[in-house]
């Protein structure tokens, strides 16, 4: 879509669920996006250094959002000592 100046403008940019890989539709009002900031040794957020997770309403409705967030954070190296049934 273009505006009157000829610039490309999108009204909606679809996201993918970080846990399942499904596309989050525009009418999925149960979805959420969580941004976790990376911090320095003093505990202050580093500007521009963050990790974004998007969880679909399907994952949240199944009650799997906390487990999915733990799994994703472990994969990205944010968590280390979380119980895992595969171990």
UniProtKB/Swiss-Prot annotation:
Its main location: cytoplasm. GO terms for molecular function: structural constituent of ribosome. Belongs to the eukaryotic ribosomal protein eS21 family. Keywords: Cytoplasm, Ribonucleoprotein, Ribosomal protein, rRNA processing. It comes from the Eukaryota. The gene is crp-7. InterPro entries: Ribosomal_eS21, Ribosomal_eS21_CS, Ribosomal_eS21_sf. Component of the ribosome, a large ribonucleoprotein complex responsible for the synthesis of proteins in the cell. The small ribosomal subunit (SSU) binds messenger RNAs (mRNAs) and translates the encoded message by selecting cognate aminoacyl-transfer RNA (tRNA) molecules. The large subunit (LSU) contains the ribosomal catalytic site termed the peptidyl transferase center (PTC), which catalyzes the formation of peptide bonds, thereby polymerizing the amino acids delivered by tRNAs into a polypeptide chain. GO terms for biological process: endonucleolytic cleavage in ITS1 to separate SSU-rRNA from 5.8S rRNA and LSU-rRNA from tricistronic rRNA transcript (SSU-rRNA, 5.8S rRNA, LSU-rRNA); endonucleolytic cleavage to generate mature 3'-end of SSU-rRNA from (SSU-rRNA, 5.8S rRNA, LSU-rRNA); translation. This is Small ribosomal subunit protein eS21. The keyword Metal-binding does not apply. Component of the small ribosomal subunit (SSU). Mature N.crassa ribosomes consist of a small (40S) and a large (60S) subunit. The 40S small subunit contains 1 molecule of ribosomal RNA (18S rRNA) and at least 32 different proteins. The large 60S subunit contains 3 rRNA molecules (26S, 5.8S and 5S rRNA) and at least 42 different proteins. It comes from Neurospora crassa (strain ATCC 24698 / 74-OR23-1A / CBS 708.71 / DSM 1257 / FGSC 987). One of its GO terms (cellular component) is cytosolic small ribosomal subunit. It is found in: Cytoplasm.
